[in-house]
From Swiss-Prot:
<keyword id="KW-0378">Hydrolase</keyword>
<dbReference type="GO" id="GO:0047429">
    <property type="term" value="F:nucleoside triphosphate diphosphatase activity"/>
</dbReference>
<comment type="function">
    <text>Pyrophosphatase that catalyzes the hydrolysis of nucleoside triphosphates to their monophosphate derivatives, with a high preference for the non-canonical purine nucleotides XTP (xanthosine triphosphate), dITP (deoxyinosine triphosphate) and ITP. Seems to function as a house-cleaning enzyme that removes non-canonical purine nucleotides from the nucleotide pool, thus preventing their incorporation into DNA/RNA and avoiding chromosomal lesions.</text>
</comment>
<comment type="similarity">
    <text>Belongs to the HAM1 NTPase family.</text>
</comment>
<dbReference type="Pfam" id="PF01725">
    <property type="entry name" value="Ham1p_like"/>
</dbReference>
<feature type="binding site">
    <location>
        <begin position="139"/>
        <end position="142"/>
    </location>
    <ligand>
        <name>substrate</name>
    </ligand>
</feature>
<feature type="binding site">
    <location>
        <position position="65"/>
    </location>
    <ligand>
        <name>Mg(2+)</name>
    </ligand>
</feature>
<dbReference type="GO" id="GO:0009117">
    <property type="term" value="P:nucleotide metabolic process"/>
</dbReference>
<keyword id="KW-0479">Metal-binding</keyword>
<dbReference type="GO" id="GO:0035870">
    <property type="term" value="F:dITP diphosphatase activity"/>
</dbReference>
<dbReference type="GO" id="GO:0009146">
    <property type="term" value="P:purine nucleoside triphosphate catabolic process"/>
</dbReference>
<dbReference type="GO" id="GO:0005737">
    <property type="term" value="C:cytoplasm"/>
</dbReference>
<keyword id="KW-0547">Nucleotide-binding</keyword>
<dbReference type="InterPro" id="IPR002637">
    <property type="entry name" value="RdgB/HAM1"/>
</dbReference>
<dbReference type="GO" id="GO:0036222">
    <property type="term" value="F:XTP diphosphatase activity"/>
</dbReference>
<dbReference type="GO" id="GO:0017111">
    <property type="term" value="F:ribonucleoside triphosphate phosphatase activity"/>
</dbReference>
<keyword id="KW-0460">Magnesium</keyword>
Length: 184
């Protein structure tokens, strides 16, 4: 089975392949732009994108919408994480949190899979925002996010370490387990 991952990020595709290759599923990157609506939840954004793409893409595909939710910022950047990263970056988040004691945050990933029907899979990892960027691995907000139970940021971890505990890794695992059961 071939499965398209609709994303412009090749790093996400490599991460996904690790979960699906053992199932005999070939994941390939499909660079197609789709509208990302302004909505209250990642689930709404992912669902809209999948339904829009279903009218334009042949065969099964999935997409991922993820967000960083910072408690002291009332969940900001949340559903606006991609836009916020492009405009103010992680330095902007650090600036907004200057002097703030509450550094609690979580990452959430929502995967929307379309095979003629919509299937949603989610993953979440709790943690906190570092006081300064650390590490050179990963992408996005990885240099400032420290997952619960660790003293290193995602950017200081190997790809394998991060994937084992990350929000996207958890959502991909849930999706792969579902696919394994439903491909029979």
């Amino acid at each position: 089975m071939r499965l398209a991952f609709v994303t412009s990020n090749p790093g996400k595709v490599e991460e996904a392949r690790k979960y699906f290759e053992p199932l005999g599923v070939e994941v390939y990157q499909l660079k197609v732009s789709y509208p990302e609506i302004q909505a209250d939840t990642l689930e709404e954004v992912a669902e809209y994108g999948a339904k829009w793409l279903a009218q334009r893409v042949d065969g099964p595909f999935f997409l991922d919408d993820s967000g960083l939710f910072v408690e002291a910022l009332k969940g900001f950047p949340g559903v606006y994480s991609a836009y916020v990263y492009k405009t103010i970056g992680y330095q902007g988040i650090l600036k907004l949190l200057q002097g703030e004691k509450n550094r609690k945050a979580h990452f959430k990933s929502v995967i929307a899979y379309w095979d003629g029907e919509l299937h949603i899979f989610t993953g979440r990892v709790d943690g906190k925002i570092a006081t300064e960027p650390r590490g050179s691995g990963g992408f996005g907000f990885d240099p400032i996010f420290i997952p619960e139970g660790f003293d290193r940021t995602f950017a200081e971890m190997t790809t394998e370490e991060k994937n084992r505990i990350s929000h996207r890794g958890r959502a991909l695992r849930e999706f792969a387990n579902w696919l394994k059961e439903n491909l029979k």
